[in-house]
Amino acid sequence: LAEYCRKIGAPIVPPVPIEDIIEKHLKLGIEFDDTHRLFGVPRSGLGLDPDILGAMFFDERRIVIDTSLDPEENPAKEGRYRFTLAHEGGGHWRLHSHLFAKDLAKASFLDEAAPPSVVCRSSQAKEPVEWQADFYASCLLMPRKLVMAAWDEMFPDRKPRVIAPAVPVEHPFVELPRIECRIGNFDCSETDDNVLDGVARPLAGQFLVSPIAMRIRLEKLGLLHRTVPHQRIIAGGG
């Protein structure tokens, strides 16, 4: 981001212009295609959602994103599209090009002339290069400084939020109520994720990312908590 800011001579404001960064600054091509057809892998799962979200062709300097994530065709997928783009072009390109650019067969399962160096599948267990690219994408789209500023604007008290504990304890956070509901033996209470997503959603809209991505980022930054950290209980009570 610092490189891009110097290049354009202006500070970054949310949402981070990820397409400009990828295409104009990093000089990478962005293409949409049916990734499952392209790689000969059948779609599966509920609604036949894509398992292959994107692929990085290092030697060709291009990124292929599944057509289902095209924000012009599916505006509701814009957050996921931007994260996939940041994952491929930000994470893999900046972190892993030295691993794959000269060894096209290293991460390929294809026998074609120009296979992708990295194929990202949502169903597979995260390998180190994948969670590294995820974290890079998260920091790129939701920079700590910008997220903290947006949080302070949304919550002038600047305090982190925590899901209200079942047993009251003294702590310095602001508690988030949870809707409790039970029908017979069926517990239909709000999940932790739903409670935290409700806080993350406005910021997700500001940064053009999914509520899930923003919620994870806010948890990593210590602004959202599922339980009161033990040290905070002591600090709050002392």
Residue ranges of model-derived segments:
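Active-site hotspot residues in diverse enzymes, especially metal/ion-binding acidic/histidine motifs
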Residues: 1-238
